[in-house]
Amino acid sequence: MKKLMTTIAAAVLVATSVQAQVQPNVLGENHAMVRVEQGKKYLLLPVQEKEENAHIAVLNGKNEMVKRLNVRLAVDKVDYFVPLELNQAMLLDITFQGDRRTTGAVKDFVCWKEIKHSDTFDTTNREKFRPAYHHTPVYGWMNDPNGMFYKDGVWHLYYQFNPYGSQWENMTWGHSTSKDLIHWEAQPLAIESDWLGTIFSGSCVTNGNDVVAFYTSAGHHQTQSMAVSKDGGLTFEKFSGNPILTSDAPDFRDPKAFWNEEAKVWNLILAAGQEMRIYSSKDLKAWKYESSFGKEYGNHGGVWECPDLFKIDNKWVLLCNINPGGPFGGSATQYFVGDFDGKKFTCESMPKVTKWMDYGKDHYATVSFYNAPANRRVVLAWMSNWQYANQVPTKQFRSANSIPRDLGIFKYNEETYVSVKPSEEMLAVRGQKIKKPTETCEIVIDVKGSATIELSNAKGEQVMMNYDAQKQTFSMDRTKSGDVSFSEAFPCVTTAPTYGSIRQLRLFIDRCSIEAFDSDGKMVMTNLVFPNEPYNIIKVKGGKATIFEINK
């Protein structure tokens, strides 16, 4: 994976970094000002994760507000650095949080000694749990995938990103591109916060040569905004008429727009409290409310958000991500199958029926690529859970996306379900057969009746999987998988219905994750794991395993 900024060796970084020797002007117990000359490209801010956020107002030479950000500035220890781009001299107006901020203490904070000027920012990986073939941010926090589209042979992935730390904050649209859905190249920030608020989740469509982004502006109220790109999605200009949609509904967010070829109209679906609202437009600017869906349908154990609406074969599918309320606690993706006429979605199932797209603990914010080739419906998910996403044992970065998945339709007992299979691109990185599991591999298991699979290492850490042919269930037990200490919600057993018999399982292992699929796409389960050593032992009862390298 290429780096977000200039990639260099640590030794070079030392040679090109200059200690800023910042002298804070302490104005009170929690307040300081720092003037920073330009000199270098970046100001590297030292972060200490256990500290509370410092609120930083960035002003230019005319004392005009440039941006606001929250950074956990280091008090007595530096965990890592984050870059603040210096395109001019700046004044940082910093307000610390907490009750131990005496004037004397603020002057002695280690951040003033450790702040650096630099023309480069080192993104060399220092994390043993960084996945090898899953998309991750090169540094910082990531959650929901946003604005995904395909154009001119390139897959575009935007995502909820914190450029100033590895916990949720400062929501911005990060951006990565790929030609094969596996190898991703990080791009500059796509959309940053403004007077309307930080940038929450949304979508992109292509309209002629333009790429049009729709997103939630998260300020005092959540409103919907748009921006247009004239260069294929690399840079965006915000619409002067923002916001384009407002409401007094709680949790009014995450617009997903698409062209409805059957109705010959643009549609947009977004979350509004415990329902999804559907709009139509002829010009992408003026939107007409058409209908709502969901008050009596599905699971309402948490906030509804991150919707999607699309057609597969002759069925329309509405995705609804919910947090909390998942089948094993925390966040998960439910879906509804039915019909849509451009104005109203009609679910074909009974109101109390709940269908889950993935029965693991770590699969959320699932959305699809707009304009995928060959009528494919390709999705990515955020591979984590809001119960512990901020606590997982990484620091340089947090969170990854799932492998790409193709959706289909199948019937079982007169109900219609969505099938989920690894995208065909995963076969292109399948390497030679090997004898033992490694930290990055694919395991194909041919099953005859019920089966058990045990993955383990020399430390006794293990993941147990069980397929019960009679009960038609598949389960995964990660209670002894490695480091489970960071959250009481992490050690668990997840269980999925298989909707018939399983003939073959495909397991994708990538350092901190296991994704399990049955070959027909009727069962999928995604779980994080944090073993202290890679699982290099496999025991299978009731089947035969073939192990493949993953060519990274």
Protein language model features and the residues they cover:
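Repetitive beta-architecture junctions, highlighting loop-to-beta-strand starts
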Residues: 54, 171-173, 222-224, 274-276, ...
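Surface loop/turn signatures of beta-propeller and other carbohydrate-active proteins
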Residues: 22-33, 64-84, 107-146, 165-168, ...
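Non-cytosolic beta-sandwich-type ligand-binding/adhesion modules
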Residues: 48-100, 172-179, 228-230, 281, ...
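Flexible loop/turn segments at secondary-structure boundaries
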Residues: 164-166, 197-198, 220-222, 275-277, ...
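Bacterial Sec-dependent N-terminal signal peptides
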Residues: 1-22
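Beta-rich accessory regions
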Residues: 22-64, 84-86, 90-101, 121, ...
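Hydrophobic core segments of beta-strands in well-ordered, beta-rich domains
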Residues: 45, 94-95, 144-164, 187-189, ...
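Beta-propeller blade signature
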Residues: 174-178, 225-232, 279-283, 331-342, ...
